[in-house]
Amino acid sequence: MAIHVITHPLVQHKLGLMRSHGISTKSFRELCSEVGTLLTYEATQNLPLEDNEITSWDGTKLNVQHIKGKKITVVPILRAGLGMMDGVMQLLPAAKVSVVGLERNEETLEPIPYFEKLVSNINERLSLVIDPMLATGGTMIATIDMLKKAGCKEIKVIVLVAAPEGVEKTLAAHPDVEIYTASVDSHLNDKGYIVPGLGDAGDKIFGTV
């Protein structure tokens, strides 16, 4: 459906810190989580609301708004997607978690699935797919394919940084999906890495650089 680039000053400031050479694992991990929180706020801004009557603190009846029965599952793509989990779950503590594992063949750049554990009623849920990077789009497309095969009807993608090639490829394959990101960067290099990007986000999150 669309690509949403979040230009909020806090998002851009934190992303700028993440791009810095020599950033520590601790700082990168914390910033990844924080930007994940801010992007999730944006991705959930259109959740439907309904009126509910409650008893307020002083015993009187009060009409308030609650999210209208929207069930959500957060879908981190292993392993780097785990770096965004804490930040996302701060806003959605009741969300169920589905996990997808794919790794990229460094020669063909094609995704290789190795793990899939989805909630049983995923067909009734909004799936929020999280991964720091949307590079070639292959891994994201394969993940969305898996979710749709399981019956998922509503999917949003949350990534810190995207390459224009990956955005175009993902939306061409799945035009009904919305993508939320802090930046669409310049391009992919010949190794399939985003330029300027963040480097290898998984290595930086887990300290395996």
From Swiss-Prot:
<dbReference type="GO" id="GO:0005525">
    <property type="term" value="F:GTP binding"/>
</dbReference>
<dbReference type="InterPro" id="IPR029057">
    <property type="entry name" value="PRTase-like"/>
</dbReference>
<feature type="binding site">
    <location>
        <begin position="199"/>
        <end position="201"/>
    </location>
    <ligand>
        <name>uracil</name>
    </ligand>
</feature>
<comment type="similarity">
    <text>Belongs to the UPRTase family.</text>
</comment>
<dbReference type="InterPro" id="IPR005765">
    <property type="entry name" value="Ura_phspho_trans"/>
</dbReference>
<keyword id="KW-0342">GTP-binding</keyword>
<dbReference type="GO" id="GO:0000287">
    <property type="term" value="F:magnesium ion binding"/>
</dbReference>
<keyword id="KW-0547">Nucleotide-binding</keyword>
<keyword id="KW-0328">Glycosyltransferase</keyword>
<dbReference type="GO" id="GO:0004845">
    <property type="term" value="F:uracil phosphoribosyltransferase activity"/>
</dbReference>
<dbReference type="InterPro" id="IPR034332">
    <property type="entry name" value="Upp_B"/>
</dbReference>
<feature type="binding site">
    <location>
        <position position="79"/>
    </location>
    <ligand>
        <name>5-phospho-alpha-D-ribose 1-diphosphate</name>
    </ligand>
</feature>
<feature type="binding site">
    <location>
        <position position="200"/>
    </location>
    <ligand>
        <name>5-phospho-alpha-D-ribose 1-diphosphate</name>
    </ligand>
</feature>
<protein>
    <recommendedName>
        <fullName>Uracil phosphoribosyltransferase</fullName>
        <ecNumber>2.4.2.9</ecNumber>
    </recommendedName>
</protein>
<feature type="binding site">
    <location>
        <begin position="131"/>
        <end position="139"/>
    </location>
    <ligand>
        <name>5-phospho-alpha-D-ribose 1-diphosphate</name>
    </ligand>
</feature>
<dbReference type="InterPro" id="IPR050054">
    <property type="entry name" value="UPRTase/APRTase"/>
</dbReference>
<comment type="pathway">
    <text>Pyrimidine metabolism; UMP biosynthesis via salvage pathway; UMP from uracil: step 1/1.</text>
</comment>
<feature type="binding site">
    <location>
        <position position="194"/>
    </location>
    <ligand>
        <name>uracil</name>
    </ligand>
</feature>
<dbReference type="GO" id="GO:0044206">
    <property type="term" value="P:UMP salvage"/>
</dbReference>
<comment type="function">
    <text>Catalyzes the conversion of uracil and 5-phospho-alpha-D-ribose 1-diphosphate (PRPP) to UMP and diphosphate.</text>
</comment>
<dbReference type="InterPro" id="IPR000836">
    <property type="entry name" value="PRibTrfase_dom"/>
</dbReference>
<keyword id="KW-0021">Allosteric enzyme</keyword>
<dbReference type="Pfam" id="PF14681">
    <property type="entry name" value="UPRTase"/>
</dbReference>
<dbReference type="GO" id="GO:0006223">
    <property type="term" value="P:uracil salvage"/>
</dbReference>
<keyword id="KW-0808">Transferase</keyword>
<feature type="binding site">
    <location>
        <position position="104"/>
    </location>
    <ligand>
        <name>5-phospho-alpha-D-ribose 1-diphosphate</name>
    </ligand>
</feature>
<keyword id="KW-0460">Magnesium</keyword>
